Amino acid sequence: MTLKLVKHEQTKVSLVVSDLSGGGAIRAFLLGQVLEKLNYQVEVIGFLFGKELYAIPPSNMSVISIPGKNYPEFFNSSKKLLNQLDGDIIYAIKPKPTSFGISLIKKIRSGRPLILDMDDWELSWYGGDDWKYSPTPKQLYRDIFKKNGALRFPDHPLYVKWIENLVSRANAITIDTQFLQQRFGGVYVPNGKDTAIFDPNNYNPEASREYYGLSGLRILMFPGAPRPHKGVEDVLIALEQLNQPDLRLVIVGGSPYDNYDEQLMEKWGRWIIKLPKCPIEVMPHVLAAAHIIVVPQRDTLTARAQFPLKLSDGMAMAKPVLSTIVGDIPEILGETGYLVKPSCPEQIAEQIQLIFENLELANERGQRARDRCVEKYSIEAMASSLQSVISQL
């Protein structure tokens, strides 16, 4: 694809992230790379409610973090962020009060155009449309006035529900799944990859396996944070069923949210190898070590609204991708992956066996996945969509 690059010497885009210690940072960094490809000046700015950045940003990308606090201290944190939010275009990541809410205030005060990106249905984490806040007067009092009261958290689902009603106030919306497009509208900008960096021709799989201490093992890789809806347990049950001593599931990065990782290790530790999170530039070297990339999403509201980045990880690196028939996944992979029913360890086990029995054939399918990724999910493909959005602001 030939991309027309336009010079934007004075045009700065501020990507506003609700919590840089959470998963939203990854989408922000990806969109930042796309905007840099279009020659915009990029700055990522957001609150930090945890101890450290969730993901290591691409080198040379400017990132500003403001300590995140609960109400009433959050008013001061917001003021600090608003004072430093100086992009010519404001690009809010996720419809949350801490990103989109702050960005709306900036838009109203400054008149600067505002784009909203959605890569999740935020309310799906709480049950979707069925979620209601119906406290007793006593509970409401506690939620507001107690030091750790629920309503003191700036992104409480009640506030998220309110702010979803303001989505139309954005000048433009970008989304990454059909589910979100049907619900909120917007322009499709997939969770793609820089296929020049993620190029399997630059890496030797055997050398990568040796570097990470994985030689002699057959590697299934899950690059990301395990959560119950992501189905990692189904892969581990499949490995238990196969009971072949050289099979391992390598989890890269782990979960910053809770102790779910430890629960997995406690139950299935013999099958798991954990690798630490790494900069995006190092990730292809890690992925090269895999024989199979697993994306075993379960059929939940949350999963249906997502475009798992792990898909484009595996596709870009020409790996066999084993995933489930959930949401957009079949359409993203086309005929280039291996699909099973969600929550079906038996089918996962069968496909693992099938892939390793015909590994040469599986790797050919992986190469077709890369070709598809270059065509549809590369940074260039994302940039083309995003350029059309920005040109209409």
What are these regions (language model features)?
Residues 261-284:
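Nucleotide-activated donor-binding/catalytic signature segment of Leloir-type glycosyltransferases, i.e.
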Residues 97, 230, 279-286, 291-315, ...:
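Nucleotide-sugar-dependent
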Residues 354, 361-376, 382-388:
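A short, well-ordered alpha-helix in the C-terminal region of glycosyltransferases
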Residues 1-59, 172, 237-242:
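N-terminal subdomain of nucleotide-sugar transferases
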Residues 335-345, 354-360:
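Conserved acidic donor-binding segment of nucleotide-sugar-dependent glycosyltransferases
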Residues 193-211:
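Acidic anion/phosphate-binding donor-loop and adjacent secondary structure
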Residues 213-230, 236-239, 250:
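Conserved donor-binding/catalytic core segment of Leloir-type glycosyltransferases
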Residues 179, 192:
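Carbohydrate-associated surface elements
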